[in-house]
C-alpha cells in the first residue's frame, strides 16, 4: 500500500502560531461575551490548534507573559516578539524556525476552533513541491488566510489582514513560488464575529 506521508520528514517542519494576549483577544465579541468568557474562548481555540500541531515542533510567537506560560505548559518553543504586529511576528517566527533547521513552516492562526490536524497539508507531496510552493488555506469567505505553508528559506512578506488570501497569492508569484490552494472546512472557520462563533458551534455539533 502506498504511503500517504510527505516526502519531507515532520522533523523538518515547524508549526508557527502567533498568539495574541488572551485578555485582549476577541474584543469584537464584547457585546456577546464577558471578558472572562472571551479569555476562555481564546484559550479553547488556541488549545485546539496546538493539539492539531502535535506531530510537529511548535513555535508560539507572543509578547504576553500569560501566553508564554501557556506555551511552556504545552511544551512549545517560544519566540518572544514584543509589540511588532502580526505580519512582523510571523516573519520572525518563520525566521527563527529556519535557525532550528526547519525547512518548512506551517503558519496558523490561533483562533481555529475546528482544527484537528495539519499533516494533510503536506501529505502526498514531494519535498521538491513543498519547498518550491506556498500552500494557502483561506477562511470561509476566501478573504483571509487562516493557514499557510511556506519554505523557510524565503524572506516571505506576510500580508495578513483584509484580502490577505489574494495578497499572499501575489506575493508567492513574486518570489517565483507556485501556489497550492486547499479548501478545508475544519480550518476555514476562525472566530472574529458573532456569526463566526455561530457557524463554529453549528459545525462542531
Identify the role of each PLM range.
Residues 1-29:
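N-terminal nucleotide-binding beta1-loop-alpha1 segment
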Residues 2-8, 163-205:
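Conserved alpha/beta core of the MobA/IspD/sugar-nucleotide pyrophosphorylase nucleotidyltransferase superfamily
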Residues 29-37:
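Short glycine-enriched, charge-decorated loop/helix-capping segments at active-site entrances
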Residues 40-57:
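A short, N-terminal amphipathic alpha-helix
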Residues 56-77:
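Acidic donor-binding segment of Leloir-type glycosyltransferases
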Residues 72-106, 185:
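Short phosphate-binding loop-to-helix
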Residues 109-113:
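The conserved acidic donor/metal-binding loop of glycosyltransferases
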Residues 115-142:
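Conserved donor-nucleotide/metal-binding helix-loop-beta segment in metal-dependent transferases, i.e.
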Amino acid at each position: 500500500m502506498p504511503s500517504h506521508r510527505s516526502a519531507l520528514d515532520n522533523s523538518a517542519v515547524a508549526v508557527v502560531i502567533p498568539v495574541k494576549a488572551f485578555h485582549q483577544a476577541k474584543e469584537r465579541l464584547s457585546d456577546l461575551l464577558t471578558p472572562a468568557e472571551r479569555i476562555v474562548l481564546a484559550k479553547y481555540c488556541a488549545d485546539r490548534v496546538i493539539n492539531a500541531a502535535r506531530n510537529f515542533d511548535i513555535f508560539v510567537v507572543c509578547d504576553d507573559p500569560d501566553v508564554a506560560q501557556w506555551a511552556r505548559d504545552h511544551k512549545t518553543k517560544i519566540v518572544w516578539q514584543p509589540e511588532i504586529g502580526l505580519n512582523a511576528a510571523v516573519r520572525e517566527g518563520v525566521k527563527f524556525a529556519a535557525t532550528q533547521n526547519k525547512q518548512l513552516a506551517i503558519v496558523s492562526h490561533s483562533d481555529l476552533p475546528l482544527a484537528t490536524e495539519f499533516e494533510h497539508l503536506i501529505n502526498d507531496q514531494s519535498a521538491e513541491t513543498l519547498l518550491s510552493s506556498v500552500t494557502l488555506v483561506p477562511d470561509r469567505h476566501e478573504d483571509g488566510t487562516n493557514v499557510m505553508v511556506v519554505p523557510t528559506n524565503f524572506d516571505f512578506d506576510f500580508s495578513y489582514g483584509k484580502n490577505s488570501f489574494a495578497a499572499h497569492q501575489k506575493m508567492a508569484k513574486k518570489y517565483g513560488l507556485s501556489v497550492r490552494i486547499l479548501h478545508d472546512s475544519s480550518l476555514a472557520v476562525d472566530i472574529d464575529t458573532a456569526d463566526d462563533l455561530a457557524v463554529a458551534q453549528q459545525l462542531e455539533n
